[in-house]
Amino acid sequence: MKQSLFDWLGQRLDGLHIVDCCAGSGAFTFEALSRGAGRVDAIEPGEHAVPVLRANAAKLGNPTGLVLHAASFQAVLPRLRDVDLVFADPPFRCYRDGAAEIAELLRLAARALAPTGRLFIRGERGADLPGGSPKLVERERRQYGRSWVALLQREDRTDRDG
């Protein structure tokens, strides 16, 4: 799925400010940096995943532009602004547990995004995004095996490309 997602995003991410919510081992984070992202905020709250994320960063020489956050997206996203791209791969259980956490992620990501920024969020086949996020509009959704990825953008975006 990672390769398909980067084919969708474009091969180069030169200078972009990217946020990787629920970064896990950092696969998306490090791929984005290798494709020229100027800054990637990798957010990972999991006590077992954070050491793996740090070890992977060290193996890669702690790449320039990498900012690791051993914290929840609720703690980090409110401090970020003018983000070009947010990638969120929350645990699928978040969709099954009433989706309140997903709704909060959408709300905070909408505030962090630049006017032309994009949010890519992954979900489990059969699950859906919660309604009631008036600041984001779903532009496209693609299926990848047992999951999907949706592209959302701010409703008030300033470009005219749609």
Located regions from the model:
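Class I S-adenosyl-L-methionine-dependent methyltransferase catalytic core
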Residues: 1-162
